[in-house]
Amino acid sequence: YDLFNDKKIGIGYGLKLADFVSIGAQIDLLNNKVSGYESNTAVTFEIGTLFKINKKIQIGAHIYNPARVRYGKNTEERVPTVFRLGATYTTKEKLWVTAELEQDLDNNLAFRAGIDYKINSILTVRSGMLSYPLSGTLGVGINYKSMQFDIIGAYQKITGISPQLGISYEF
């Protein structure tokens, strides 16, 4: 969809509290632009926790934009506040199967599911789906030393294909 552009840049930090629990937080700078209108910017944050039930199962919870910030000073449009609860099942350390419930305060409850297959120590392929709005994703991850690069294409009927890029560094 050529008339809309949405950007997010974040910096986050995660901490392992014990062998079975980790927490994380991220600060995000958001910008969206609709053709013919002003660009809107916002700063928000997100927090999450991950519980390792056993070697194969993990359960996580995440809150995005708990402060309910708005895009800019001159708009009533709020950045979505989203709650997520999910689980991951790992088989043979190469295949992850995930499921997640997502509740945006302004939209319907959504279900996500995905698979992540580690081909080797460098390359991972991923695919997933979201129930609302109905969409699918396909991507690859490249791991090099402490860096991870993710290239993803998401498809949704109204907006078409949305390319996404992620870069992570692990200290």
List the predicted regions and their residue ranges.
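Subset of outer-membrane beta-barrel
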Residues: 1-171
